[in-house]
């Protein structure tokens, strides 16, 4: 079964990263801002939200909104941010399941995506 990923952030999701995720069986969509992300989340079945944080946007508010809108649904949240900015800690405190440092390295991102999805499935008893 294909798992759906929503990438949110001002930073452009590189074509090579998208292709690598798709080659690993993930369907990837992307939006650049919080408002369309919340709309996608309410209208679609999304398994994982990847939020690319930077200091110009308040992606941590999006993480809180995702948790509020989805409640106890199984959707995971993975934050990407530059180390040393404090954003990784803030993202985890806001409800992100995991953090990956920027810049995005495809292999590392794929491993993180799989870990978060596995963890979320285990939490809700879907992974036997």
Segments and roles (model prediction):
Residues 32-48, 55-56:
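Acidic, metal-coordinating helix/loop segments flanking the phosphotransfer/catalytic sites
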Residues 114-128:
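The C-terminal output helix
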Residues 47-70, 84:
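Conserved phosphotransfer microenvironments
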Residues 42-44, 67-73, 94:
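Conserved phosphotransfer cores of two-component systems
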Residues 104-113:
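C-terminal output helix
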Residues 11-30:
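Two-component/phosphorelay signaling modules centered on CheY-like receiver
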Residues 61, 83-99:
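Alpha4 helix (beta4-alpha4-beta5 surface) of REC/receiver domains from two-component response regulators
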Residues 73-86:
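A short, hydrophobic beta-strand element within the central beta-sheet of small alpha/beta folds
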């Amino acid at each position: 079964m294909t798992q759906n990923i929503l990438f949110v952030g001002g930073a452009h999701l590189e074509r090579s990263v998208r292709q690598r995720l798709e080659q690993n069986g993930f369907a990837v969509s992307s939006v650049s801002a919080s408002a369309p992300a919340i709309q996608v989340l309410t209208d679609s079945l999304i398994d994982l939200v990847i939020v690319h944080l930077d200091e110009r946007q308040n992606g941590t508010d999006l993480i809180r909104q995702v948790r509020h809108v989805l409640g106890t649904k199984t959707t995971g949240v993975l934050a990407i941010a530059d180390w040393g900015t404090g954003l990784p800690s803030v993202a985890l405190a806001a409800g992100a399941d995991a953090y990956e440092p920027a810049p995005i390295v495809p292999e590392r991102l794929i491993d993180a995506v799989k870990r978060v999805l596995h963890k979320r499935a285990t939490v809700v008893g879907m992974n036997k």
